[in-house]
Design a protein with these regions (language model features):
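Active-site substrate-recognition segment that forms the wall
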Residues: 13, 19-23, 81-83, 198-326
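Dinucleotide-binding Rossmann-like beta1-alpha1 core, especially the glycine-rich loop
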Residues: 47-123, 132, 248-249
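N-terminal Rossmann-like FAD-binding beta1-loop-alpha1 element of flavoenzymes
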Residues: 4-30
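C-terminal catalytic lobe of FAD-dependent flavoproteins
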Residues: 295-373
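Flavin (FAD/FMN) cofactor-binding and adjacent substrate-gating region
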Residues: 73, 93-160, 164, 170-175
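Short hydrophobic core segments
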Residues: 6-8, 187-200, 345
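Conserved beta-strand-loop-beta-strand element in the redox core of flavoprotein oxidoreductases
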Residues: 170-187
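Glycine-rich FAD pyrophosphate-binding loop
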Residues: 23-43
């Protein structure tokens, strides 16, 4: 079978890349080792935050503004609700992250409300010290991640895309055409888009032609859910990011299973996916979050459940978006990338079709930034 494009990794970004490729009329194959949506990658666990006022830097904001539009368009086209626009509450002190959030609001005229510590307690029952403040970003919130991936794949298939659930064992190149060999089949493709998350090193290792080195690591991440009679989506509680020491908690209002909370910078650095042990394998799977979070959310009750996933990391925590070969495009290190999924999926397909990359993408996300490291 011959295709115009193969998308390797049909998760967050790959599912939307497949959708946009099929929408452009390209003969498309989405390849994933597991039947998506699944629990072996980075996007499961029901929800992912969406925000535009970005503490990680303003270079991301144009991509986020486009993503906001694309999420809405996709919801309308598919007649499905994927985005809860309940707001995103950033909470912290005079940190670089919070100053970046404030700068984003000002420079991009984003809809937001500033709250002091007293107002945070009165309005949301969140207890913080007097030097903390909140920035409530209006019309943002969170996206239903598993449902989004499933919906994008289904939409791609309705447009003629094929899915291949199998493990890739070999990728070679002959006369400008890529041949992808899986355990049970073989296809030929003109172009490849790799968006394989924490599996990217496995994919690149079976490429039998020269490619630049891509520095993507893997971190095992956990999230916890807590029972509560408060902090509910139905009560108007927003998604949140809360500064804690040199780290951040992030979380989601209770809409089914309790208040979901994660912690940004903790988690074991691992080398292979086999090292991602199940939730509860380490004592800190509950302690890293549960030991501290109730200081800020006094109405939380008992821990109810936990989950584990893997995050792909670049050395500087920024995305890697670049051509690895003339017709092989790579997007990786997307540890905070789910909110960008439709934008990055569309960007990757367009880059392959035009053989061009926007100058701002080259400036901030090119693989070349690591050449001197």
């Amino acid at each position: 079978m011959t295709y115009d494009i193969a998308v390797i990794g049909s998760g967050s970004v790959g599912s939307f890349a497949g959708y946009y490729a099929a929408k452009m009329g390209l003969k498309t194959c989405l390849i994933d080792k597991f039947q998506a949506p699944h629990t072996q990658g980075s996007y499961h666990g029901d929800t992912r935050i969406f925000r535009i006022a970005y503490g990680e830097g303003e270079k991301y904001i144009p991509l986020l503004q486009e993503a906001y539009t694309l999420w809405g368009e996709f919801e309308k086209e598919q007649n499905i609700k994927l985005f809860e626009r309940c707001g995103l509450l950033n909470i912290g002190s005079n940190s670089t992250f919070m100053q970046n959030v404030l700068s984003s609001v000002k420079n991009y005229d984003l809809k937001a409300k500033i709250l002091n510590a007293k107002e945070l307690q009165e309005n949301y029952n969140i207890c913080v010290s007097d030097d903390f403040f909140g920035v409530l970003e209006i019309d943002t919130g969170f996206v239903y991640s598993d449902l989004s991936v499933k919906s994008a794949i289904n939409a791609a298939c309705k447009l003629g895309a094929h899915t291949l659930c199998d493990e890739i064992v070999r990728i070679c190149k002959e006369n400008g055409v890529y041949k992808i060999q899986t355990q049970n089949s073989s296809i030929q493709v003109k172009q490849i888009l790799i968006s394989a998350g924490s599996y990217v090193n496995e994919v690149l290792s079976v490429c039998e032609f020269d490619l630049p080195k891509v520095p993507v690591g893997i971190r095992r991440k956990v999230v916890n859910w807590f029972d509560t009679d408060s902090y509910k989506l139905s009560q108007g509680f927003p998604a949140f990011i809360l500064e804690f020491e040199d780290d951040y908690f992030y979380g989601f209002p209770d809409f089914a299973d309790g208040l979901k909370v994660g912690r940004d910078k903790v988690g074991e650095i691992i080398s292979t996916r086999e090292e991602r042990v199940e939730f509860g394998s380490y004592e800190q799977d509950t302690l890293d979050i549960g030991k501290h979070i109730k200081e800020f959310f006094p109405d939380l009750k008992d821990f109810s459940k936990g989950s584990v996933c893997t995050y792909p990391l670049s050395p500087d925590d920024d995305f890697i978006i670049d051509f690895l070969d003339e017709n092989l495009f790579f997007m990786g290190g997307l540890s905070h990338g789910f909110k960008f999924a439709p934008t990055l999926g569309l960007l990757g397909v367009k880059a392959l079709q035009t053989q061009k990359l926007d100058p701002s993408i080259k400036q901030y996300f090119s693989l070349k930034r690591f050449e001197a490291v």
